A protein has these predicted regions:
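An internal, short helix-loop-strand segment that often contains or flanks glycine-aspartate motifs
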Residues: 46-82, 125-239, 254-255, 268, ...
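C-terminal soluble interaction/assembly domains
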Residues: 253-308, 314, 320-323, 346-348
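Hydrophobic membrane-insertion alpha-helices, especially the h-region
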Residues: 2-17
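Short hydrophobic-aromatic micro-motifs
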Residues: 37-41, 103, 144-157, 303
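Beta-strand-dominated lipid-handling architectures at cellular/organellar boundaries
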Residues: 115-117, 241-243, 257, 270-271
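One face of beta-strands
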Residues: 37-39, 103-105, 229-231, 239-247, ...
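Short, low-complexity cationic-aromatic patches
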Residues: 29-32, 90-99, 138-150, 235-239, ...
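Long, low-complexity, Ser/Thr/Gly/Pro-rich intrinsically disordered segments that act as flexible linkers
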Residues: 19-126, 130, 143
Length: 351
């Protein structure tokens, strides 16, 4: 009898663990440290929808070209998933706050070749729990990198080495479904199923709008966010690429004001003729911006849009989209008078 009870308990525990894990955030996200914002990108479906990684780029930065030559790893082709933890800095003695990042990258790479390359760049290699941590100087900071498995790497430019050590500790416990940053544990259930790009972020009160790239909000809209609000943004493919941004505020009044402000921006955007690379109006870009809508749901503002696949492909494969009035024909500039003409004019006046 006790054997039967033990089997039932063990089976129940396994089923519970499987169910919890199936509802947990992706593995890459669960390895991240505590942070102010989390950003996740799944590149595998993006490659199916676009030409990303299918054609070698015409030009590469020489430093990146050398990285590819020595490691055999191309981000466009070989990176499958990426998770980023964003750590907002604090201004000290008049110096502006510096945002730091920790990341988990999953893909296909040769551990031996990548390890040899990192060792050449590192000023120090620390051994921690059977893993090498490479300390690499980059722009007056130290970037620490660790190869966690045959398809997973961790990196962080946070000052404390404890951050990447904690990521290694999390990797050791990756089978458990309860790990991950508090933001993810609390709000990941709000991310729509099948999202290929999503972020959960608390906007920094000290950062400028242009420094809030992790919020996935267009243009300067992130500058309108109420203090201490929270943003959940996501994109997932159906007939089009669906975008959704939930801005969670502290009150219905805050949500109403933000909704009205964004609504004003939407009216302005929809009144413009959208052009791509100065080539005239683009129907896919226009369709994307025409689909933008915002509404209030109690203490939240909800922004939605549907992006045509054609526009999605343009974003990843063509020059940047220019948002603004369509280019107008310019009148030719008047030609300057020649010295001979000036002398003739002077003589006629003298007569």
């Amino acid at each position: 009898m006790w054997v039967a009870v033990a089997i039932v308990v063990i089976a129940g525990g396994i089923v519970t663990a499987v169910l919890l894990r199936s509802r947990a955030a992706p593995d890459a996200v669960r390895l991240l440290p505590e942070s102010d914002a989390v950003l996740y990108v799944n590149l595998e479906p993006i490659r199916l929808l676009t030409d990303l990684g299918k054609k070698p780029p015409k030009e590469r930065d020489p430093q990146y070209e050398e990285f590819v030559r020595q490691t055999g790893f191309e981000f466009e082709r070989d990176l499958d998933k990426a998770a980023f933890a964003i750590h907002y800095g604090v201004a000290v003695k008049g110096k502006p706050a510096e945002t730091r990042y920790s990341e988990i990258l999953q893909g296909h790479f040769d551990s031996a070749r990548v390890g040899d390359y990192l060792r050449k760049l590192a000023t120090q290699v620390e051994r921690y729990r059977d893993y090498d941590i490479y300390d690499i100087p980059v722009e007056e900071r130290t970037v620490r990198v660790a190869l966690l498995g045959f398809d997973t790497a961790a990196a962080s430019n946070v000052d404390s080495p404890e951050v990447i050590r904690g990521m290694i500790d999390s990797y050791k416990q990756a089978a458990l479904p309860f790990t991950g940053p508090a933001l993810v544990s609390q709000y990941y259930r709000r991310v729509p199923l099948g999202s290929i790009v999503w972020t959960i972020a608390r906007p920094s009160a000290n950062s400028a709008a242009q420094d809030r790239g992790e919020l996935l909000l267009p243009g300067s809209w992130s500058g309108l966010l109420p203090r201490a609000s929270l943003v959940i943004a996501s994109a997932w493919p159906l007939n089009d690429v669906h975008l959704r941004v939930n801005v969670i505020t502290h009150s219905a009044d805050e949500a109403r004001r933000f909704t009205e402000q964004v609504g004003t921006y939407l009216m302005l955007f929809k009144s413009l003729e959208i052009s791509v690379d100065a080539g005239g109006p683009d129907k896919d870009v226009k369709a994307a911006f025409d689909s933008l809508e915002v509404h209030q749901d109690k203490s939240e503002a909800v922004l939605t849009a549907k992006v045509p696949y054609a526009f999605f492909k343009k974003v990843l494969s063509e020059p940047p989209v220019e948002l603004g009035p369509a280019p107008q024909k310019q009148e030719p500039a008047p030609q300057p008078e020649t010295p001979t003409a000036k002398r003739k004019t002077s003589k006629s006046k003298a007569k």
